[in-house]
Amino acid sequence: YLGATVIFLCFLGLLLYKGFHKWWLLLAIILALLLSYGKNLPWLTNVFIDHIPFYNKFRAVSSIQVVIELCIPILAVFGLTQLFKPEAFKKNCFKALKIALLTLSGICLIFIFFKNSLFDFVGLRDGQYASYFGQDFVEALRKDRSALLTADALRSLLFILFMAAVIWAYLKHKINQNITVVILGLLILLDLAGVDRRYVNNDNFRSAIKVDKPYQANEIDKLILRDTTVFRIYDNSDGSTKASYFHNSISG
């Protein structure tokens, strides 16, 4: 997740930074994005697989997206540095801020109000889910997907508005450069951490004791362990790996 806040600064960088670095970074972003489509864009992907050394060693074509994750923050830094240039440059900053705000907030609003026209929210396994749980479950699942898109689009919109407000306050001399950097940094941190914790949070960490000794032997396990002959056990319980942890199991 790159973050709406980082992309906002990146957009400012594209508008404000005039150096030659902007163009190769932008080209790298576009090329990496196209390559990440893989078999969905075969005319480009096949050229790279056949002619670019070691490109076919990637386990997944989406790995190329790390280039995007590198280039966009660099452009974001360029955008931030342009904001802190001398006073004569401020007029361009106001114009760029307005364009970035209207463009990115407009995209968020499109996702909020026209999502059902843009997406059908149908998953690859919806047919399988329907056979297992019924069509009502699938319809509820699609509504949840739609609600998640709305919530994230609204979340991104709020972060963009906060970022724009802080930068506007700096350009209007309401706050100084140090305070601006701190507030923008906190907004970026909140944006990234909020999404990252959906994937890695406190529930993903286990104590060393639980990792080293995930199961405790009960009396039956202790009794079986006394048998030194060659055998395998058959466990018809809940499919737990406990039996395989202590004994040679039929299931491996």
Segments predicted by a language model, with ranges:
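Conserved luminal/periplasmic juxtamembrane motif of membrane-embedded glycan-processing enzymes
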Residues: Y1-G252
